[in-house]
């Protein structure tokens, strides 16, 4: 049983879009109920924001984030570990083109070089934590047409609140801008993934965690998810669990799946739904 307060930011969001959204056609041909612009704030000191009104596949969230941090663009590494969440978009050889991990770790420069945005962000957090330029972008306009799927969670920024007591630690917050948000299937993954990343970066930079702020553009519920959403909204949320990171590796790129444990995850049963490809 978690000692954290019960929060329902995600469920309130899902209910808001289901109630106030407009019908909109979309690229997949499925149809959506959509609103434009929404924000949720999660205090990471109130628990790890893993949705509780349905069981969320935590293993896939952790593996996908580690895969991004590898700078990888081939699903083979994920498949070898039993994770198939990217298979629908992969080419026959498993490649996805220059997607998230490639842009995070090796954004191409005009002179033929590459920028490791994650390494640069960590370096700046350690040397100039008051910077307003600690940003990582996956939205590389010049390479969008080479990607199997254009970035949905496109851009994120870190912010350090100074220590409030002598000898205390600063607090690391992260804000994500997600241009396209599949609220039922995708957003629970995205919230947990960036909350996990914030914890990892905070550990590497000797900071405490602050808030994770999720900001969405086109926020939608697919028409073929309506029954699942109604079921989920009929359930009462539990308190969020606690994230434990068992060791501090030498760098942000050296974490392994076994380093993470979520304690006290009380949740309702999983709800299956089709993915719009």
UniProtKB/Swiss-Prot annotation:
PANTHER family: THYMIDYLATE SYNTHASE 1. It comes from the Bacteria. DUMP binds at residues 27, 132-133, 179-182, 190, 220-222. Belongs to the thymidylate synthase family. Bacterial-type ThyA subfamily. This is Thymidylate synthase. Keywords: Cytoplasm, Methyltransferase, Nucleotide biosynthesis, Transferase. Pathway: Pyrimidine metabolism; dTTP biosynthesis. One of its GO terms (molecular function) is thymidylate synthase activity. HAMAP family: Thymidy_synth_bact. The active site is at residue 152. Its EC number is 2.1.1.45. It holds the Pfam family Thymidylat_synt. GO terms for biological process: dTMP biosynthetic process; dTTP biosynthetic process; methylation. (6R)-5,10-methylene-5,6,7,8-tetrahydrofolate binds at residues 182, 276. It catalyses: dUMP + (6R)-5,10-methylene-5,6,7,8-tetrahydrofolate = 7,8-dihydrofolate + dTMP. SUPFAM superfamilies: Thymidylate synthase/dCMP hydroxymethylase. It is found in: Cytoplasm. Homodimer. Catalyzes the reductive methylation of 2'-deoxyuridine-5'-monophosphate (dUMP) to 2'-deoxythymidine-5'-monophosphate (dTMP) while utilizing 5,10-methylenetetrahydrofolate (mTHF) as the methyl donor and reductant in the reaction, yielding dihydrofolate (DHF) as a by-product. This enzymatic reaction provides an intracellular de novo source of dTMP, an essential precursor for DNA biosynthesis. Disulfide bonds: none annotated. One of its GO terms (cellular component) is cytosol.
């Amino acid at each position: 049983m978690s000692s954290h307060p019960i929060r329902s930011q995600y469920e309130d969001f899902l209910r808001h879009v289901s109630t106030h959204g407009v019908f909109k056609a979309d690229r997949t041909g499925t149809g959506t109920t959509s609103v434009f612009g929404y924000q949720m704030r999660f205090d990471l000191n109130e628990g790890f924001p893993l949705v509780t009104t349905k069981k969320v596949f935590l293993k896939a969230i952790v593996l996908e984030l580690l895969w991004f941090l590898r700078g990888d663009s081939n699903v083979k590494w994920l498949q070898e570990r039993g994770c198939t969440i990217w298979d629908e978009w992969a080419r026959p050889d498993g490649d996805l083109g220059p997607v998230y991990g490639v842009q995070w770790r090796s954004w191409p420069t005009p002179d033929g070089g590459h920028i490791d945005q994650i390494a640069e962000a960590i370096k700046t957090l350690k040397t100039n934590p008051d910077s307003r330029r600690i940003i990582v972008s996956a939205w590389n306009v010049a390479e969008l047409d080479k990607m199997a799927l254009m970035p949905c969670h496109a851009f994120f920024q870190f912010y350090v609140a100074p220590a409030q007591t002598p000898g205390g630690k600063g607090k690391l917050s992260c804000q994500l801008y997600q241009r396209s948000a599949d609220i039922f299937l995708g957003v629970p993954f995205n919230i947990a993934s960036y909350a996990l990343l914030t914890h990892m970066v905070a550990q590497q930079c000797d900071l405490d965690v602050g808030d994770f702020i999720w900001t969405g553009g086109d926020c939608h519920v697919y028409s073929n998810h309506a029954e699942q959403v109604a079921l989920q909204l009929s359930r009462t949320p539990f308190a969020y669990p606690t994230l434990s990171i068992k060791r501090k590796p030498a760098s942000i790129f050296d974490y392994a799946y076994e380093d993470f444990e979520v304690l006290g995850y009380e949740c309702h049963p999983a709800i299956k739904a089709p993915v719009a490809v």
